[in-house]
């Protein structure tokens, strides 16, 4: 019986090896599926937030004259405000509201972070308004901060009777999935 390959030891070793391989395969598939689901939901959330922000920009906000009701450099006055850049008529934007949001988002890192809930976003944001003679930007520019994921939405609007192009970017430099 010394020359037989199918001895008890060989069968036992193959069973252990096969079981180990099977367990590793199940673990590997579970981790990759978990990562895939987390990444997918993260992108879906970002897409929803960029669409929501794009729509919110055209609203007048709450209250309609929110920019007159706050101090742009004091985030404690922003409590009961929802930010919108529109005047409440179609796709017309308010220069005063744009300038107020620019001041709010660029005053300090803490004030920028405080503007995110006012805009309804949990990720970082960047809003760019371009016309033939002016460019206005609010938020953090993503491409100098090594973004992990970026979602962009574009729309046309009117500012002081001049057509403008609004680009809304929601981005993050953190992973969505398992770290």
Predicted feature residues:
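Long, compositionally biased, intrinsically disordered regions
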Residues: 15, 22-179
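Glycine-centered recognition micro-motifs in short, flexible terminal segments and loops
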Residues: 1-18
């Amino acid at each position: 019986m010394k020359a037989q390959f199918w001895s008890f030891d060989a069968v036992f070793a193959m069973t252990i090896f096969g079981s180990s391989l099977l367990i590793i395969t199940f673990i590997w598939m579970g981790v990759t599926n978990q990562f895939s689901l987390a990444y997918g939901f993260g992108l879906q959330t970002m897409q929803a937030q960029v669409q929501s922000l794009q729509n919110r920009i055209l609203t007048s906000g709450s209250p309609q004259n929110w920019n007159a009701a706050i101090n742009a450099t004091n985030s404690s006055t922003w409590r009961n405000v929802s930010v919108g850049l529109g005047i409440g008529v179609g796709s017309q934007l308010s220069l005063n509201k744009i300038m107020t949001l620019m001041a709010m988002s660029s005053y300090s890192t803490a004030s920028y972070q405080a503007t995110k809930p006012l805009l309804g976003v949990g990720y970082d944001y960047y809003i760019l308004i371009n016309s033939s003679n002016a460019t206005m930007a609010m938020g953090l520019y993503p491409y100098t901060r090594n973004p992990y994921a970026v979602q962009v939405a574009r729309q046309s609007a009117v500012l002081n009777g001049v057509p403008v192009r609004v680009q809304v970017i929601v981005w993050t430099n953190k992973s969505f999935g398992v770290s």
